[in-house]
Amino acid sequence: MEIFNTVASLKNFVAHARAERKTIGLVPTMGALHRGHISLIHRAVAECDICVASVFVNPTQFNDKRDLECYPRTPEADAAVLAEAGCHAVFMPSVEEVYPEPDTRVFDLGSVAEVMEGKHRPGHFNGVAQVVSKLFMMVEPDKAYFGEKDFQQIAVIRSMVNLLGLPVTIVACPIIREEDGLALSSRNVRLGSEERAIAPSIARILGQSRTLRPAHTPEAVTRWVTESLNALPHLQVEYFEIVDGNSLQRIDNWQDTDHAVGCITVYCGEVRLIDNIKYED
C-alpha cells in the first residue's frame, strides 16, 4: 500500500491508474479506524480495481472546538489496518495541504442539510461538502463509500454531487455493530465503563420501537423512544426524528412514505452518539 501526504503525489497515482483504465473506489475517513471502516474498504476492493482511502480529521466540519481537539488520532495504526484490509493507497494530508487557503465556499445543499444534524450542528454539513468535494476532485473516483450510521450525511453528499454534477456513484453501506448492538464509532473509545455498558440501550430501544409501529403514530413512537432513553442513566437524547428516508422530512403518518427512518443523536455522558433504524416492512 502506498501512503501519500501531498495532493500532487496522490494525483500522480490517480493519473497512472486512469491511464491503465482502472476503476477507483474512494473511502473517506477521519481515522481512528474500526470494523465499520474496514467493511467499506472490503466493499471498495471487491467492486473497484483500486481502493483509495483518506485519513483526515477535517476541521471545517466541527462546530465544537473541543470535539475537534478530542477526536481520536491514530495514523500509524490506521495505516496498518488499511494495508491489512487490502487498500491500495491512503491519503494522509496535513490541514495546510488540504486547505492552503481558507475554503469560503458555501453550498446550497437543500433541505436535507437543514434538519436534524444540520439544525444542531450549524455549518457541519457545509464543512463536510467542502472536504468531500475536494477529495472527489483530487481522486475522481468512480464510486465513493460511506456508512449508513451517518444516514443524513449520505443524503447531503448525494445532494452535493448533484449540485456539482460530479460523475461519482455514492455507495451506502450497512451499519456495523458490536455484538451488544452498539453502532461502531470512532467516538466509542471515549466512553467510560458505565457509559459503555449503557450505550447499547440506544440500539435496543430503537429495535423495540419497530414493534410499536402497527398500533402507534410516528409521533407516539418518537415520544416513547425519547422518554425510554432519557429515563436511563448517562443518556440524554438530543433529537429523535422519524423521517422520509429520501427527503429527510418528518412524517406524521406511516403511510406518508415507504422508506421511514428513525434518526437519533444521544449524549452518553459527554460523548455524542448517532444511530438510526429503518421502519420498512
From Swiss-Prot:
Beta-alanine binds at Q61. Transmembrane segments: none annotated. The active site is at H37. It is found in: Cytoplasm. InterPro entries: Pantoate_ligase, Pantoate_ligase_C, Rossmann-like_a/b/a_fold. GO terms for molecular function: ATP binding; pantoate-beta-alanine ligase activity. Disulfide bonds: none annotated. Its EC number is 6.3.2.1. It is an enzyme of class 6 (ligase). One of its GO terms (cellular component) is cytosol. Pathway: Cofactor biosynthesis; (R)-pantothenate biosynthesis; (R)-pantothenate from (R)-pantoate and beta-alanine: step 1/1. It catalyses: (R)-pantoate + beta-alanine + ATP = (R)-pantothenate + AMP + diphosphate + H(+). ATP binds at residues 30-37, 147-150, 176, 184-187. GO terms for biological process: pantothenate biosynthetic process. (R)-pantoate binds at Q61, Q153. Gene3D superfamilies: HUPs, Pantoate-beta-alanine ligase, C-terminal domain. It comes from the Bacteria. The keyword Cytoplasm applies. Keywords: ATP-binding, Cytoplasm, Ligase, Nucleotide-binding, Pantothenate biosynthesis. NCBIfam families: panC. Catalyzes the condensation of pantoate with beta-alanine in an ATP-dependent reaction via a pantoyl-adenylate intermediate. Belongs to the pantothenate synthetase family. Homodimer. This is Pantothenate synthetase. It comes from Porphyromonas gingivalis (strain ATCC 33277 / DSM 20709 / CIP 103683 / JCM 12257 / NCTC 11834 / 2561). The lineage of its organism: Bacteria, Pseudomonadati, Bacteroidota, Bacteroidia, Bacteroidales.
